[in-house]
Amino acid sequence: MIGQLSASVPVFSGFKIHNSIAVQENLYQAEMATTSQTKDEIALRVIDYYTRLYKAQKRIELLKENQKSAQQRVKDFIELEKNGIIPRNDLLKSQLQVSKIQLNLDEINTNLKIINFYLVTLLKLNPETKLEIRESDFADFEITTIPTNDHLAIENRKDLEALRFQGKASEANIKIAKGFYYPTIAIIGGYTALDLSNVITVQNAMNIGVGISYDLSTILKNGTTVKLAENKFVEVQNSEAMLMDYIKIQVQKSIEDYDLSLKQNVVFSEALEQSAENYRIIKDKYDNGLSDTNDLLEADVEQLSSKINNALTKANTFQKYYELLSATGQLSQTFTISKN
């Protein structure tokens, strides 16, 4: 009867075990950063659809108001044309304006339905849900910090963080590949029990030692593996450099867009007052026979355009502000994304 037991415990393997753990830890962190970046992108899409939905609803509201006054003008012009006070051409112009308003309403209503569907789908709501955006959401929203450079983006962007962790994982992979150039050292132990009837009996024989092994074929082939690992590391570094350049451009554009929206707030507010006063003057002149229908309709269109621009400017600033936060990696710090 014979019984044997042997065991080998590696004590050195070219740091491959240590670096393999580092690879997995860094890849895990890269995946977590990518997940956070995806959440930020989804949040920004929700904000975009939310703002576009409000803009569509507000346009419809203002167009319907304008449509009522335009339809009333047509009724007045019909009577004036019957009495020979205005030419038929003026009546046709007023009717054409009503038709244009209706076409705009139809187009915006279609866009409204599409945007609403996109948003409820993204939010996992019932497809039949009709969302109504409150104007106060845009009028009362608070601006906390305004980024003025790309420093925060370099620190906070999760897509950049993911690439950095991938770079660390690639560095560890290079070390793993180079680890095959080293021998494997292990502590080897054994136990033997031997009983040959009437010949020999060995009980509790134990041995312990150190084993060193080299795989020469692996060493000869390992140069290619090392080069591949190094090329992967360079590729990740290049991707990181390209992303940093893109982030800097994106941040600068977002800063400029936000500043422009603030300037537009002032201009559109002034334009609203100017267009209202212009329409009042033109209407007064028209009633006194000092201006024609073209002037009246043009002033009406300008006033409508000013109303729309002024009504949407706060929503535009709201959108540009959150785009700036997203570009600088601060969007997730502004609110919490949750799923019930």
Residue ranges and their predicted role:
Residues 118-126, 323-334:
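Long amphipathic alpha-helical coiled-coil segments
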Residues 2, 48, 93, 184, ...:
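Transmembrane beta-barrel architecture of outer-membrane proteins
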Residues 1-7, 149, 206-212, 254:
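Hydrophobic, lipid-facing positions within transmembrane beta-strands of outer-membrane proteins
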Residues 8-37, 161, 180-206, 213-227, ...:
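Small/polar (Gly/Ser/Thr/Ala-rich) solvent-exposed segments
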Residues 125-190, 334-340:
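Amphipathic alpha-helical coiled-coil scaffold segments and their short linker/junction regions
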Residues 41-154, 254-257, 261, 303, ...:
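Periplasmic alpha-helical coiled-coil/stalk elements that build and connect Gram-negative outer-membrane
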Residues 38, 42-61, 79, 115, ...:
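Amphipathic alpha-helical coiled-coil segments
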